Structures are given as C-alpha cells and as structure tokens.
C-alpha cells in the first residue's frame, strides 16, 4: 500500500521592510522645505522693492507712495541686484515607519529687480542649493542638487503692499543605502510654488511695525527610481507631495545712525497653519524578487507652527547695503535654523 508523503508548503513571502524606502521618502519633504524658503525670499524682495528705496530694509515692509517720485523717468535707483549665501540645518523627528532625518543645506541666490512704475516693481531670482540628508535611525543618505527660478511683482498703495511670487524648481537626487556595497540610485525631482502676501506699514520716528498676512502653495514631485548594487536593491514609485498654508504675523524694526553708517535691526514672528496637505507615499518592490511590495506613508510637518527671525542691515554706501539674517522654523516634529549673508546694490 503506497504511503502519501507530506508536502512542505512553500514559504510565505514577506513585504519589504519600510526602512528600505526611508531615504527616498524624505526627498519630497526636503524639496518642499527648499521651495518654501525660496518663496519667503521672493516675498521679502517683493515687499521692499516698491516705492522709495531708502525706506526699505532687508526684512521687507512698506513705504509711503506719496514720498516716492511720481513718474518712472524721475525714479532714482530704479534697478536693484542682490546676492546671498545661506546655510540651513534642520531635523525631522522619527514617526511611524519613518526613521527621521537630519538635513544640511547650502546655497546661493542672485536676483535683479526693476521699478516699472511708481508703486509697481518686478523681480527675477535664481536659487542654487545642495541638500545633504541623513536618516537618523538607518545608514542611508542622499544629496539633492536643486535649481529654482522665481519671479515676483509688488503693488504699493500708501502704507499697503501686496506681493505675489511664483517659483519653478528642478534637480537631481543621488541616494545611498547601506554600508560596504550599498544600494544606490539617481533620479529627478521637480517643484512648483506660489505665494501672496499683504503687509501694512505703521511708523513712528525710527520705529516701524509691519503686520503681514498671506498664503502659499507648493508641490514637489520625485521621479520613480531603481536601485543598483547592495543586498536587496529596490524599485521606488513616483512620489507627489502638495500643501497649502496660511500665515500671519508682524515685523518690528528700528533704524539708527552709527557714525556715518545707517543701521537697521528688525525681528519678526509668524504663525503658520497648513490648511491642506497631501503627502502621498512611496511603494517599494524588490528589483530581483523574493519579497512583496511595501507601501510607506509620506512624510509631513505638523499642521501648526511658528516662524521667527532677526535681520541686521548696514548701509555701506548710498547704493550698497550688507545684511545678515537668521530664520527659525519650529513645528511639533520639525525644526530648522538658517543663516543668510547678503549684499544689495541699487542704481
């Protein structure tokens, strides 16, 4: 009588660990952060560009249109050029399947501005940056080289200034995962953004207070990618992150004369609310099989946050100004500190 042999069931495949996609998961968040910073730069330039140049500081604000020349041909110093170098250190805390990250960003900005009519100005600016990202809980890192091109326009009426800005960014991402013979990938990223901000200037003597309200929108896309090398290289899906924010706050500034140099110091605070957010997610699958695909939810900042900073400006000559800026951004799961050194010329 034949004896039936028991068959061993095939092993059940398990999904890939979420850690295999962490470094790619941080890319849209980092790109959005870069875009938000550049939009803030353009808003500042829009706010201080319209009207009489002598009444503006690097922190923005407004000016009295009645004090400005009333024809384009009569406007002195119609043109502006500025150059900035900046550095940023930030941290996103671990949450869920994401192991958190640390970011170091270095970049430079160059821009040109023009007063096209009394109370109306336009500007064009380019931002080139490099972001180095390290995942806190895993041996994973990436480098994002991002180019952003932005434009702004400012409208001034009395103490009111309305600034509008838009950006377009594109860049390359190179990621490394693991040690020894790591898994590596190279892919592209794209960025779009827009901002509108309304401010009102109140001044008394050397003091000024500038309340501001506004909103911004940004969208970041990271291309699909395929890793090579390493023990378990993976394919990653395209990622899309999009958010809309509203914000409001105020700047307080003071101007004084030190010997023959005009000095200006201002501080600002701003509350931020993310009213709409879709951070999508990432699906990873093994290049060579052997495991099931895995979906990982996207990375986002907490809804409510506070921005704060300070600006010191020194007028080196009637048409040249040097300024230094500190910017801090604080969320429940995210913190960023940035420093900027800039030089502005007018003619």
Segments predicted by a language model, with ranges:
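Outer-membrane beta-barrel porins/channels
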Residues: 190-197, 210-218, 228, 232, ...
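Short, structured patches in soluble enzyme cores that scaffold and shape functional sites
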Residues: 166-168, 200, 211-221, 269
């Amino acid at each position: 009588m034949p004896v039936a042999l028991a068959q061993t069931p095939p092993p059940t495949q398990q999904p890939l660990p979420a850690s295999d996609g962490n470094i790619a998961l941080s890319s849209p968040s980092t790109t959005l952060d870069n875009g938000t910073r550049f939009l803030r730069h353009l808003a500042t330039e829009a706010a201080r560009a319209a009207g009489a140049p002598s009444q503006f500081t690097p922190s923005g604000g407004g000016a009295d249109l009645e004090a400005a020349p009333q024809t384009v041909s009569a406007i002195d110093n119609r043109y502006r050029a500025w150059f900035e170098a900046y550095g940023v250190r930030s941290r996103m805390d671990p949450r869920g399947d994401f192991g958190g990250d640390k970011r170091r960003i270095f970049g430079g900005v160059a821009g040109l501005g023009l007063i096209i009519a009394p109370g109306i100005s336009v500007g064009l600016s380019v931002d080139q940056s490099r972001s180095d990202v390290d995942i806190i809980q895993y041996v994973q890192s990436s480098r994002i080289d991002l180019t952003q091109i932005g434009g702004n326009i400012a409208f001034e009426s009395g103490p009111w200034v309305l600034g509008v800005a838009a950006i377009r960014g594109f860049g390359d991402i190179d990621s490394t995962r693991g040690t020894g013979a790591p898994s590596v990938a190279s892919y592209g990223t794209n960025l779009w953004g827009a901002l509108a901000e309304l401010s009102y200037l109140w001044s008394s003597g050397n003091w000024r207070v500038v309340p501001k309200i506004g909103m911004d929108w940004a969208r970041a896309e990271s291309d699909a990618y395929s890793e090579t090398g390493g023990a378990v290289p993976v394919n990653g899906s395209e990622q899309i992150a999009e958010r809309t924010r509203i914000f409001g706050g105020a700047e307080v500034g003071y101007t004084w004369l030190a010997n023959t140099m005009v000095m200006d110091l201002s501080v600002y605070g701003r509350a931020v609310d993310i009213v709409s957010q879709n951070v999508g997610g990432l699906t990873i699958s093994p290049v060579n099989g052997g495991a099931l695909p895995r979906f990982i939810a996207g990375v986002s900042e907490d809804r409510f946050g506070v921005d704060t900073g300070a600006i010191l400006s020194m007028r080196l000559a009637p048409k040249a100004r040097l300024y230094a800026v500190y910017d801090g951004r604080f969320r429940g799961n995210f913190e960023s500190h940035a420093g900027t050194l800039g030089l502005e010329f007018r003619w």
